[in-house]
Every structure is written in C-alpha cells, then in structure tokens.
C-alpha cells in the first residue's frame, strides 16, 4: 500500500507532502505554499482532491492530487467563518465547515470536477461548533458544540440541505466541551473527545444515540488545565487514541469487541502541544504534530497490544496542527 501524509503548518502557511513507506519512514515529496494560514484538511472520497481551510480570508482551497500525492491548486471559494474542521459526505458531493469562532456551520457544493464552490446553506447560532461528522449511512451530520455541551444532529437531504433533529441531540456532562469524534467500523458506536474535562464519551446507536460510557483519558493525578484535542481509531476497531495539549500526551484505550467499552491502557509522551494526529490506513503507524515543537513524529502501533513506540521525528513548518493520510 502506497500512502501519503499531509501536514498543515498555519504559522508558515505551508503543507508538507510526505511519502510513508511500510517501515514507517517518511520522505518529503513537496512543500506547498498555501494562500493563507492552513488548518483543517480532508481528502475527497475518490482520493483525487485535498480540501483545506484557510484564514484570515476564510476560504476552502481545492488541490488536485497527483500520482505521487503531490498537490496542484485547482480552486478557492469563500466560507462564512474561520474554518475549524471540514469534512465531506460519503459521496463527495458536499463539504461541511464548522466554525468555532464564528458559531456557524456551512454546506458547500462540490462540482463534477471535484472543486468546492460557494456555500449553499449557512446555519448560524451554534455555540462553538468544533467538528462536523457524517454518519456511516451518509444521512446524518453530527456536530459537537463545545460551549453547549451537546452534539447537535442534522438530517441531510439528497441535495445536501441540513435539517436539525432536536429530539435526537446528545448531551454531555456540564463543562465537558465536546470536540472531535471517531466512528467504530461496526457502524454502531461513536466516540467523542471532550476538550475541557478530557473525558471520552461512548455513544451507541439504537433508535437514538445513547451514552453507554464516559471514561477519563488522563492520569488522575495529572495537574494543570485539561485541554484535549484529537481522537482516532485504528481501522480494525481495536484501539482508540486521544491527544491532550497541556501534558503533551497521547492516551491509548483498548476497545471491547462490540465497541461499547473502553479500557485505558497507557499514556505516551509526544510532540509538544499535539493539536492533531492521524493513524495510517494499515493501522501500523500514528503520526502526531506538535504546535509548539514544529515537528511531527511517527510511532509504530503494536498489532496486538496497541502500544506506541516512537520511531522518528521530522521538522515541518511552523505551528503544525493537522495531519491527514491518503492511501493511493
């Protein structure tokens, strides 16, 4: 399997494009100067385009992906707020942008050439939406709103129009601050990292989502303000990882067979202030970015235990905060 790693460094307005080999080694393919501070990134479902959100001129930039993973800019379109997280539907027809600072969620059409256009819907009045996550069936969009302590749920029509389902929303503990989500491959369980108390909520789907577990991701005796960031699951659904920026820790959970129960298995020091990380498509490697270290690091994931072993660190641009992996 050929894989490419994209790292976004907003403080230097750069994307670094890396080749990832089977031994977990990275080789730099390209350094792209982006027309703004690049933050969230997402690969299109057909793996032909990379979409990135930039500021201060709030926009989505469309890049065509070449045969080696290299990028060529194809288009740029405006959005109504600073992009905190972007995603697409499963068919690659719509792009969703959540704006934490501007308290809105937008829907943009993606044309037949894979280029993102202007927004066709803007939903205002959300309090600090931090991500937009399409479900397995491509029917519902789940939006954790950090300052509301709830996950709003929107039904998606065929033309991409979103309608909120207030009766189905998920509430968290007061002051938890829901942020990012990971989806189990069994299509029944979702995990949400809460930024402010560093817990992980486990939601299982029946007629509606129900919280079946809340577990702390950090050592009980850890001092300091909690500031969790990212969450990802291995492709086989056996291991879950979260990052926390004050302690610069990656936390590891073992997942039960049905996905409903997490067991904390360990903590690992990583890059300073790990805002974003990713797991490769083989489930063998975890790539973490350090906003304060200006480096990324690659760690191997033990196939059976899920234990992390750091392999190598690589310098990138300034303030790296997002990692995306593409399987060519």
Swiss-Prot record:
Coiled coil: none annotated. One of its GO terms (cellular component) is cytosol. InterPro entries: 6-phosphogluconolactonase_YbhE (IPR022528), Cycloisomerase_2 (IPR050282), Lactonase_7-beta_prop (IPR019405), N2O_reductase_N (IPR011045), WD40/YVTN_repeat-like_dom_sf (IPR015943). Its EC number is 3.1.1.31. It catalyses: 6-phospho-D-glucono-1,5-lactone + H2O = 6-phospho-D-gluconate + H(+). One of its GO terms (biological process) is glucose metabolic process. Pathway: Carbohydrate degradation; pentose phosphate pathway; D-ribulose 5-phosphate from D-glucose 6-phosphate (oxidative stage): step 2/3. The keyword Hydrolase applies. GO terms for molecular function: 6-phosphogluconolactonase activity. Pfam families: Lactonase (PF10282). The keyword Ubl conjugation does not apply. Keywords: Carbohydrate metabolism, Glucose metabolism, Hydrolase. Belongs to the cycloisomerase 2 family. Catalyzes the hydrolysis of 6-phosphogluconolactone to 6-phosphogluconate. NCBIfam families: PRK11028.1. This is 6-phosphogluconolactonase. It comes from Photorhabdus laumondii subsp. laumondii (strain DSM 15139 / CIP 105565 / TT01) (Photorhabdus luminescens subsp. laumondii). The lineage of its organism: Bacteria, Pseudomonadati, Pseudomonadota, Gammaproteobacteria, Enterobacterales.
């Amino acid at each position: 399997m050929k894989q490419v790693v994209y790292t976004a460094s907003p403080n230097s307005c750069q994307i670094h494009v890396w080749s990832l080999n089977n031994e977990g080694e990275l080789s730099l393919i390209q350094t792209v100067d982006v027309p703004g501070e690049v933050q969230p990134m997402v690969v299109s479902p057909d793996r032909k385009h990379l979409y990135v959100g930039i500021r201060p001129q709030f926009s989505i930039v469309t890049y065509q992906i070449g045969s080696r993973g290299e990028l060529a800019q194809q288009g740029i379109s405006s959005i109504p707020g600073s992009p905190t997280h972007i995603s697409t539907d499963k068919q690659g027809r719509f792009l969703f942008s959540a704006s934490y600072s501007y308290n809105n969620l937008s829907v943009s059409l993606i044309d037949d050439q894979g280029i993102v256009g202007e927004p066709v819907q803007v939903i205002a009045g959300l309090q600090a939406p931090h991500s937009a996550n399409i479900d397995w069936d491509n029917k519902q969009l789940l939006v954790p709103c950090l300052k509301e302590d709830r996950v709003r749920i929107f039904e998606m029509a065929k033309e991409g129009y979103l309608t909120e389902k207030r009766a189905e929303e998920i509430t968290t503990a007061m002051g938890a601050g829901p942020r990012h989500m990971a989806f189990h491959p069994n299509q029944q369980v979702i995990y949400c990292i809460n930024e402010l108390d560093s817990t992980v909520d486990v939601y299982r789907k029946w007629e509606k989502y129900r919280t079946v577990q809340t577990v702390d991701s950090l050592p009980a005796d850890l001092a300091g303000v909690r500031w969790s960031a990212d969450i990802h699951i291995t492709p086989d659904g056996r291991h879950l990882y979260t990052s926390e920026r004050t302690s610069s820790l990656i936390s590891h959970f073992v997942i039960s067979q049905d996905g409903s129960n997490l067991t904390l298995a360990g903590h690992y020091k990583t890059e300073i202030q790990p805002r974003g990380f990713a797991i490769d498509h083989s489930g063998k490697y975890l790539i973490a970015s350090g906003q304060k270290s200006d480096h990324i690091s690659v760690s191997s994931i033990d196939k059976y235990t899920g234990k992390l072993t750091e392999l190598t660190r690589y310098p990138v641009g300034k303030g790296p905060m997002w990692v995306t992996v593409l399987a060519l």
